[in-house]
Amino acid sequence: MSRRKQAKPRSLKDPNCKLEDKIEDGEAVDCKKRPEDGEELEEDAVHSCDSCLQVFESLSDITEHKIHQCQLTDGVDVEDDPSCSWPASSPSSKDQTSPSHGEGCDFGEEEGGPGLPYPCQFCDKSFSRLSYLKHHEQSHSDKLPFKCTYCSRLFKHKRSRDRHIKLHTGDKKYHCSECDAAFSRSDHLKIHLKTHTSNKPYKCAVCRRGFLSSSSLHGHMQVHERNKDGSQSGSRMEDWKMKDTQKCSQCEEGFDFPEDLQKHIAECHPECSPNEDRAALQCMYCHELFVEETSLMNHIEQVHGGEKKNSCSICSESFLTVEELYSHMDSHQQPESCNHSNSPSLVTVGYTSVSSTTPDSNLSVDSSTMVEAAPPIPKSRGRKRAAQQTSDMTGPSSKQAKVTYSCIYCNKQLFSSLAVLQIHLKTMHLDKPEQAHICQYCLEVLPSLYNLNEHLKQVHEAQDPGLIVSAMPAIVYQCNFCSEVVNDLNTLQEHIRCSHGFANPAAKDSNAFFCPHCYMGFLTDSSLEEHIRQVHCDLSGSRFGSPVLGTPKEPVVEVYSCSYCTNSPIFNSVLKLNKHIKENHKNIPLALNYIHNGKKSRALSPLSPVAIEQTTLKMMQTVGGGPARASGEYICNQCGAKYTSLDSFQTHLKTHLDTVLPKLTCPQCNKEFPNQESLLKHVTIHFMITSTYYICESCDKQFTSVDDLQKHLLDMHTFVFFRCTLCQEVFDSKVSIQLHLAVKHSNEKKVYRCTSCNWDFRNETDLQLHVKHNHLENQGKVHKCIFCGESFGTEVELQCHITTHSKKYNCRFCSKAFHAVILLEKHLREKHCVFETKTPNCGTNGASEQVQKEEAELQTLLTNSQESHNSHDGSEEDVDSSEPMYGCDICGAAYTMETLLQNHQLRDHNIRPGESAIVKKKAELIKGNYKCNVCSRTFFSENGLREHMQTHLGPVKHYMCPICGERFPSLLTLTEHKVTHSKSLDTGNCRICKMPLQSEEEFLEHCQMHPDLRNSLTGFRCVVCMQTVTSTLELKIHGTFHMQKTGNGSSVQTTGRGQHVQKLYKCASCLKEFRSKQDLVKLDINGLPYGLCAGCVNLSKSSSPGLSLPPGASRPGLGQNESLSAMEGKGKAGGLKTRCSSCNVKFESESELQNHIQTVHRELVPDANSTQLKTPQVSPMPRISPSQSDEKKTYQCIKCQMVFYNEWDIQVHVANHMIDEGLNHECKLCSQTFDSPAKLQCHLIEHSFEGMGGTFKCPVCFTVFVQANKLQQHIFSAHGQEDKIYDCTQCPQKFFFQTELQNHTMTQHSS
């Protein structure tokens, strides 16, 4: 038995299972039989036939086998097999499939047999059917631990239970790309996608039916094989056997079977093969295929015209042409007693619901060739061959018969139950769509009669839906050829086509056409049009009634036209119009909405009694006494307009529909739109607000601007790394890479230095050689002459020897003297280009005449060269004689290297190395091609001329003034020029504090008092003219310039006779003038220096103690009669902070500061009889500035932050703290104790940098340390009291770190 995985078969949808997934159009999987575990072997199953024991893989295969092929099965009791029959949708059938009711079912009578094909995997029992086995397995609750919370079904695996729950929850994540269908499983979606495939490559060679798979075609061909072997006279295979060998119409090749002929045509003559999109037409005599109906008719007339085989199926009369046969068939439809049309009988009857027994009888088909004027009431897919009729409705034509069911598509099988028919339709005719049932109250579309009954009970509160439905008037139609009664024209049309059509396949595939007025049936469209034109458009005609009733009691069908189509098709029912709009205009609202809104042209329903009565009266008036109507006229039933052509009549009806159909307007702004889609887009704009957010890709946070997102990315998702360029290792902090460099790349290198001559050597061997040659050989003679290299034992000997090297060697060209001959020779070679092989006797005149002649010639040549070159050396600076220079004897150019000189001579004078310069001097001066326009000197290269021209132009000016754009050759000249642009030339006052500056020293000192003017990028700024300077030299130039311009200012006054007057100094408070600077006290207030007289200082002490004197400042005498009005007017004292000048403690108010001074610093309180201030023992810590770097060292207590100026005072102060408080200093943050405040402060620093990777950063200058105590030492040495950041709100103390403030608050102010 095969155990490979196979998808379970598709099945009809159970109406009671409301959480099923819809598969395909009208197909669903049963909630009980639906496969949940496609991946498990225990959930897969195979199907076997009970009669012949043949095994099948799907339910559709075994169903088709039992119906058509199995010789041991009757073919009508298939529904007895639960694995093949269709489950009923009634409540009783639901109980049978529920696992909770499985105990009451007798499914285990056959268990225990050793040969049964379905054994239980949990026990020894076996069963004959798979359904029995599934019911039995549900009893093993201990083996199936997972239970569905909806239907209590048990599962072995959790994934099976979860997949099953999706059936109840409706979780459908697999969507069809072609339509809006959704499925919970991918295999169901694959099955559904096959319905959208228009290409069916597998064609039946007999009936030309298409299939999606070869297996389906193989099963279909078995049906033809069974029919071929049987004794059916109407079989097409028998017809083919009776015929001669078939021949191809193209190549005259003969074939025994039609499938061989069709295969030959498809392969050899593809242009002659019928199109797959259209149904092929086959001749009833020779079975030749045709594409068009006209070709088939011409073929029958020409080839088979002599044979009278066009027989009538009613009277067996034969005709030569098909048209004659059609005319004869029309005569059969005329009644014998009258000349009226033999239309199908209309009987107003009620129908009884059969939902209790066959609720799924709604299997209907939508014919694509339906006549537009036919009523669109849902058609029944299964039709009855005989139905029980009452004698009042049908008269003698009614008869009692057993209810049987037959397929309307293949018309070959009879089924005893509707369930078997449903299985047949689902397995054999999957390509046929499904139709629904419509409620007569609210016109709601329902999938089945059972759902219709439930809808009537719940919505319309019907106690007995069967009685209500039967009481409702309905129109039924009776076939004139048999006793069949149907409920709509479409069903009657299918009945006539299938039961009373010709044997000709072309005639069978065509539709029967019914008149919408009298319901007369016609076999051709042309005959129907002729009938409407001749009968219903002629007032003289009297054929209007039914042949059964004999009186015009039938209501006139109202006409509805689609206004969205170009040809304006006409429909006689709103339902048909709605269906047309749904299929062809999906975005257009249905016409049913217009009827409910009261916008229909006629308010009465066509089936209502009032409408029937009114239309009947109108028709009677028209038939009886109305005016005569001309033939071929069309009269509008809305306005009475008459038209002679059908096109103009349809166009006129379209105008009525345009006025009836409402306009699509926006409920917000009343704007009109042509269709529903544009209206929906417009209305969405009213309810839509577009907001732009910028989302972080890492943490999904939203930001309203790009700047916020970039700031977030820089703060949270950006890391700065440090890469070592030596080993390419990466570090996350600066401290880490510093440690890495100190550990791995700090290589030790030893240098060996000689202590005697301070020479350095790389290794010890070189030092030993040096000592051997320089110190051992001349041992005892450590003093060496720098001129001749001779060594001496004592320094006195060396000094006596140096006197012998007096400058006795004089140069005969420039009169320079040298100590040694070698220096003179070097000077001659470098400066005068004299190369002598023999040292001349410079002290005597004993030189030979030849030597003197050569020297004279060379001297003359050099003199002439200097004169002709326009004093080239004069334009350049003198070269230092200590550096070796190589001069050109032609142009006088000097170079520091001999190779540069050789390159110059080769480039500019065409003199190669080694050639005699004296021989070519005169000739070389004339050969140059590049001539100087200034001095007429020639050069051999353009670069040489360019360098020479620079000597005439002067130095290159690379420095440009940023104010006026003038260029200068040096930075010094540019600085002196920039000062001339100053706007403060006549004042020497600081533009920030307005303090007068009298000298350059005061100017430079005052610039240091404004630290906010410093900038590490641009340098300093002058306090007088506010220009930016880049160096201290430039700042000094500014000071010199400004002090020279202000030399006749306010501080230095001159009389008319030019006599110098003594410099005066003013008090910054009372503006009194003093002749001596010592009479004023210099104060540093807010970083600015001020001068106050003694009286102002004394009075400001009593009113505002915050103004203090710096230590070491001179205290002049205090005047008793000095006024404070000027100081009060200026408001100088009011701007001082309330901070104690002695201990630098800040207070909130002046009263607290006064109390502090009276109690703590009594020695600073001035005595009324005293005229001088006392020098305080404790003074505030001054600001550290460049001008105050030489002040006294201060000491500050960590505990109370008092400042002392000597170590003894702070030691005594700390000892008092230890006596009062002891050695236990507790950290309030972690309850640790320390023996000193310094250790406690170091511990609090560690608290501040917890989680920072072991690094400690200074909060003031941001210097990084790896130890907390190093940071503590740095703070004490580099930063003072004024740099502390955190102030205590309850006392004047300040702290560097927040943890210090927290610990201080918890210790001192916790109460």
From Swiss-Prot:
Interacts with EBF1. Interacts with SMAD1 and SMAD4. Keywords: Activator, Developmental protein, Differentiation, DNA-binding, Isopeptide bond, Metal-binding, Nucleus, Phosphoprotein, Proto-oncogene, Repeat, Repressor, Transcription, Transcription regulation, Ubl conjugation, Zinc, Zinc-finger. Residues 83-102, 1105-1119 have a biased composition (Low complexity). It is linked to Defects in Znf521 are a cause of B-cell lymphomas. The Znf521 gene is a frequent target of retroviral integration in murine B-cell lymphomas. Involved in most B-cell tumors in the AKXD-27 strain. Viral insertion into the Znf521 gene in the AKXD-27 strain causes Znf521 overexpression in B-cell tumors, resulting in the up-regulation of EBF1 and the increased expression of a number of EBF1 target genes. This in contrast to the role of Znf521 in other cells as a transcriptional repressor of EBF1. Misexpression initiates tumorigenesis by perturbing B-cell development via an interaction with EBF1. It is found in: Nucleus. One of its GO terms (molecular function) is DNA binding. Transcription factor that can both act as an activator or a repressor depending on the context. Involved in BMP signaling and in the regulation of the immature compartment of the hematopoietic system. Associates with SMADs in response to BMP2 leading to activate transcription of BMP target genes. Acts as a transcriptional repressor via its interaction with EBF1, a transcription factor involved specification of B-cell lineage; this interaction preventing EBF1 to bind DNA and activate target genes. InterPro entries: Znf_C2H2_sf, Znf_C2H2_type. Gene3D superfamilies: Classic Zinc Finger. There is a cross-link at K1146 (Glycyl lysine isopeptide (Lys-Gly) (interchain with G-Cter in SUMO2)). This is Zinc finger protein 521. GO terms for biological process: neuron fate commitment. The gene is Znf521.
